[in-house]
C-alpha cells in the first residue's frame, strides 16, 4: 500500500491532568480538573486535606516520564502531544512571577523528548484552568482571565522558544457548550448567554496567544483544537437535514472564528434569535483577526440528528446528544465506530477552512484483559485504528493536507469523561485500577508492536 507523505508526524497524545499526578508537588496549585475528581460531567468537589482522587497520582507520569518516553521512542514516535498544567506555572493563575519548579519540569520533559528525536506538540490549556481564577474572577466569565492567560502563554513561549515549535491553544474548545466548568470555569448550570460570553473571552485569548506565539517564536506553528463531532441526518426529511446543518455549525463556528477571524453570520443570527447579547469590543474584533496556522481535532465517533424532539429525547445517548446510527457498531462505552466518517470529516474541514489538518486524538477506549503470562491481545484496538488510518490515507489521496496523527492515550491514563482508568486506550498497559490499586508497572500490549510497525513503514503496511 502507499505510504503516507514524507515528514508525516506519528505519535500519541496525553494530557497533564490525566497522566502526571503529583497534583500538589513542587508548588503546583489546584485546577478545575482537581475539583472534578469524578470527571468532566461529575459534580464539583472543593477538595479537602486528606481526601484523594484517582487523578491525584494518575499514572505518575510526573516521576516516571523517562521510562514512558523511552517506550514511545521504542514505538518510533516522532511526535508527542502533551499539555502544560497552567497551575504548575502560575499556581493561582494571576501571579506576575512564574513558579520555577513547574517551568523546570517541562524543560526536563522537552529535553527528554529531544534526546529521543520526538517533536513536542504542546497544548496550553487541556480541560483545566487555575481554580484560583474561578474563585477570584469567575473563570472565563471575566475579561481578567484573558489577561492572565496571555501572560501565561507569553511566559511559556519565551521559556521554551528553542524547544517547542508546535503549539495548540485550547483543547476541544467547543466542549464548553457541553461541560462549562471544564471548558470555561463556569457552573454547569450556567445560562447560554453566560457560557457564550465566556467562550468569546476564550476565543479572544486564543487569538492573542496566536499573535504572541508568532511574535516570540517566528518559526513556530500554532493551531486550535476542536472536538470533531460528525453528524448525519437520521432521515432524508428536509427538517432532519437542516437540523443536522445547524448542529454541525454549533461546533464548526469555533473553527470559523479561529480560521477566518470573525463571527459567521449564522452565529450572529443564533444570538439574536435566542436573546443572547455578547459584549464584543473593537479591540476584540481586531484581536480575532489573527488566525491559526493549522487545525487540530479529535475524532472518536459520529452520530445522527433528528428534528423530531420527542424522538431525539428518546434515543440520544452520547456526550454530544446525538442519536444512534442504526448502521454503525458501538464501543463498550456507547461511542459509535465510524472510520469512513473520519474521511468525510477531514474532507469537510479541508473544504471549509483550507488549512492543514492534524488529528491529535483518536482511539478506542476498552477494557483490556491481562492473560496469565502478562500478555494483552487487544486485536479490537488494532482493528479500530487500522480502519481509521486507512480512511485517513484516503483523505490525503482526496487532496486533504495533513500534518500528522497522534493517537489518544498511547499509554493507559485516567479518562476525562468519568475519571476511570478501566477505559483503556493505550498501547502500553499501566497496572492501576479504578480503586487506585496496582503497581503502576508498564507493559506492552499487542497493539504496541502493531503501531511500531505502522510507523516504521510510514503507513505502507496498512491493509
Where are the regions a protein language model picked out?
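Catalytic domains of carbohydrate-active enzymes, especially glycoside hydrolases
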Residues: 60, 64-85, 290, 294
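Glycine-rich, proline-tolerant flexible connector loops at the mouths of alpha/beta enzymes
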Residues: 84-98
Amino acid at each position: 500500500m502507499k505510504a503516507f507523505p514524507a515528514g508525516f508526524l506519528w505519535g500519541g497524545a496525553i494530557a497533564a491532568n490525566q497522566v502526571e499526578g503529583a497534583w500538589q508537588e513542587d508548588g503546583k496549585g489546584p485546577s478545575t480538573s482537581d475539583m472534578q475528581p469524578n470527571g468532566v460531567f461529575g459534580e464539583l468537589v472543593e477538595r479537602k486535606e486528606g481526601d484523594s482522587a484517582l487523578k491525584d497520582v494518575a499514572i505518575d507520569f510526573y516521576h516516571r516520564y523517562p521510562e514512558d518516553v523511552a517506550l514511545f521512542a521504542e514505538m518510533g514516535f516522532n511526535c508527542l502531544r502533551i499539555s502544560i498544567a497552567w497551575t504548575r506555572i502560575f499556581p493561582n493563575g494571576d501571579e506576575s512571577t512564574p513558579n520555577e519548579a513547574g517551568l523546570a519540569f517541562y524543560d526536563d520533559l522537552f529535553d527528554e523528548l529531544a534526546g529521543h528525536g520526538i517533536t513536542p506538540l504542546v497544548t496550553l490549556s487541556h480541560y483545566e484552568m487555575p481554580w484560583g481564577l474561578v474563585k477570584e474572577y469567575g473563570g472565563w466569565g471575566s475579561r481578567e482571565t484573558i489577561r492572565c492567560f496571555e501572560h501565561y502563554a507569553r511566559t511559556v513561549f519565551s521559556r521554551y522558544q528553542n524547544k517547542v515549535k508546535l503549539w495548540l491553544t485550547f483543547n476541544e474548545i467547543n466542549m464548553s457548550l457541553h461541560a462549562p466548568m471544564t471548558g470555561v470555569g463556569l457552573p454547569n448550570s450556567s445560562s447560554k448567554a453566560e457560557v457564550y460570553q465566556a467562550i468569546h473571552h476564550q476565543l479572544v485569548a486564543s487569538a492573542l496567544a496566536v499573535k504572541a506565539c508568532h511574535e516570540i517564536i517566528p518559526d513556530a506553528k500554532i493551531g486550535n483544537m476542536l472536538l470533531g463531532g460528525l453528524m448525519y441526518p437520521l432521515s432524508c426529511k428536509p427538517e432532519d437535514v437542516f437540523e443536522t446543518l445547524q448542529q454541525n455549525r454549533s461546533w464548526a463556528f469555533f473553527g470559523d472564528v479561529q480560521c477566518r477571524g470573525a463571527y459567521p453570520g449564522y452565529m450572529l443570527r443564533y444570538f439574536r434569535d435566542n436573546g443572547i447579547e455578547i459584549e464584543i469590543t473593537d479591540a476584540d474584533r481586531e484581536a480575532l483577526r489573527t488566525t491559526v496556522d493549522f487545525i487540530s481535532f479529535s475524532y472518536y465517533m459520529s452520530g445522527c440528528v433528528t428534528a423530531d424532539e420527542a424522538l431525539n429525547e428518546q434515543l440520544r445517548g452520547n456526550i454530544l446528544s446525538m442519536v444512534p446510527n442504526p448502521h454503525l457498531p458501538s464501543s463498550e462505552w456507547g461511542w459509535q465506530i465510524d472510520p469512513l466518517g473520519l474521511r468525510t470529516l477531514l474532507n469537510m474541514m479541508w473544504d471549509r477552512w483550507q488549512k492543514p489538518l492534524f488529528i491529535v486524538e483518536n482511539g478506542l477506549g476498552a477494557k483490556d484483559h491481562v492473560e496469565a503470562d502478562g500478555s494483552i491481545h487487544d486485536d479490537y484496538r488494532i482493528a479500530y485504528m487500522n480502519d481509521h488510518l486507512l480512511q485517513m490515507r484516503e483523505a490525503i489521496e482526496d487532496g486533504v493536507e495533513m500534518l500528522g496523527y497522534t493517537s489518544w492515550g498511547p499509554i493507559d491514563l485516567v479518562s476525562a469523561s468519568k475519571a476511570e482508568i478501566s477505559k483503556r486506550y493505550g498501547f502500553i498497559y499501566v497496572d492501576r485500577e479504578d480503586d487506585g490499586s496496582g503497581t503502576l508497572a508498564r507493559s506492552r500490549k499487542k497493539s504496541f508492536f502493531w503501531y511500531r510497525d505502522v510507523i516504521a513503514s510510514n503507513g505502507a503496511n496498512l491493509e
